[in-house]
Amino acid sequence: MLIVLFRSKDIRGGRFVRPILIFRTKRSWILFRIGPERRREAEMPTDLCLFSNSPDPIVPVFGTSSAKVTEWVSHQSNPFDKSGVILDIIFYIYRNIIE
């Protein structure tokens, strides 16, 4: 399990951090956004823009705060076995969501 924190700007130009949880199994990997209730438990900010990713192609879906931990990007092969794949995903998210 890995938590990636992206620094970003909100619509008012302020700064905030987007937490993304990357969880892996033997055959797949999954990206979760971290929901507000879990951020409260961890004493993290709760006023973040939230999103989930769809499997193919990786397309960000924007939403509003919700108590549910949303889903997924799931693949049959494990990208952690292939160097650089997870970094490609992180950079995709950074380029297309954060900037």
Swiss-Prot record:
It is found in: Plastid, Chloroplast. It comes from the Eukaryota. Pfam families: Ycf15. This is Putative uncharacterized protein ycf15. Belongs to the ycf15 family. GO terms for cellular component: chloroplast. Keywords: Chloroplast, Plastid. InterPro entries: Uncharacterised_Ycf15. Its main location: plastid. The gene is ycf15-A.
